[in-house]
A protein has these predicted regions:
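Peripheral/terminal regions associated with large enzymatic or DNA-binding modules
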Residues: 19, 28-45, 49-117, 121-264
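Residues flanking N-terminal targeting/processing segments that define the start of mature chains
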Residues: 15-23
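Conserved ATP-binding/catalytic motifs of P-loop helicase motor domains
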Residues: 11-13
Length: 264
């Protein structure tokens, strides 16, 4: 009889509605806190992913055109700028064909801009960030990262007149150099299919850009300088020697980049 009473008492205690309510409230407290904590963690993670996505949307991929005589220099440049690809030619391809090869390879990358540097390019400090900031506000889909002295001679006086501008870009109908070029990735396949043959690569890209009504925008100052060394190309189409002094008019960085332009 005593055992029966104790059993009923235990059942009665287990079925006590007040105790059951207390147990339910106790069980639910930590669950509410866990859900709040989980939501915060998820939001932070989502923001991080959005930040990564933002960095990925305004990106560029860099390739380098190099000659075997400058292989060591080219490898240093590749490491400095974080280039994704480099083509080193011993002269069998030639300058123009090697440029085309690098542009063609870069089209495999899913980025907004494709950038080709020559092996004698000298990048500014903090080059990748400066390049991102400049390309984000570029006034043209065809950008030259270098504007040099000495060559071409017929443009030097015009550049000198524009050199005092406060604009962040100098614009011109012609691509004057091939030391550092950035082109919006969407245009590169069409460019490669329509480059005229038999021209130096800067003149070939100029001809294509003019036909497509693209102005060339030069970063001002130049984000790339030119190592004024003995040229790898012995004979030029114009048969004119390359004299010393082929360096950027201005080479440096900006705290911020805008779309302000000044025609050359």
């Amino acid at each position: 009889m005593g055992r029966l009473q104790r059993t009923r008492t235990r059942r009665h205690r287990r079925e006590n509605p007040i105790q059951r309510l207390g147990q339910m409230l106790h069980r639910h407290r930590p669950r509410i806190r866990l859900r709040q904590h989980h939501t915060t963690t998820h939001t932070t993670h989502h923001c991080r992913r959005e930040n990564h996505t933002h960095k990925a949307t305004m990106t560029h991929t860099i390739g380098i055109v190099a000659h075997t005589k400058r292989a060591e220099q080219a490898h240093r440049l590749m490491e400095t700028v974080g280039a994704a690809y480099m083509s080193i030619d011993n002269g069998a391809l030639g300058c123009e064909a090697n440029h085309r090869k690098v542009w063609q390879h870069l089209t495999r990358h899913n980025t907004d801009w494709l950038v080709v540097l020559e092996d004698d390019a000298i990048p500014c400090d903090n080059f990748r960030d400066q390049l991102d900031a400049a390309l984000a506000v570029a006034p043209s889909p065809v950008v030259s990262l270098y504007l040099g002295r000495e060559r071409p001679r017929e443009y030097q006086q015009r550049i000198a007149k524009a050199a005092d501008t406060t604009a962040h870009w100098l614009t011109c109908r012609r691509l004057l150099h091939a030391v550092g070029i950035a082109i919006h990735a969407d245009l590169v396949p069409h460019m490669l299919n329509n480059l005229p043959n038999g021209k130096p690569i800067d003149e070939a890209i100029s001809a294509w850009a003019r036909h497509q009504s693209h102005t060339i925008a030069y970063t001002w100052p130049s984000l790339i300088d030119h190592a004024d060394e003995t040229p790898m190309i012995a004979t030029r189409n114009d048969n004119q020697p390359r004299t010393p002094g082929r360096v950027a008019w201005q080479h440096g960085t900006r705290d911020t980049w805008t779309t302000d332009t000044q025609p050359i």
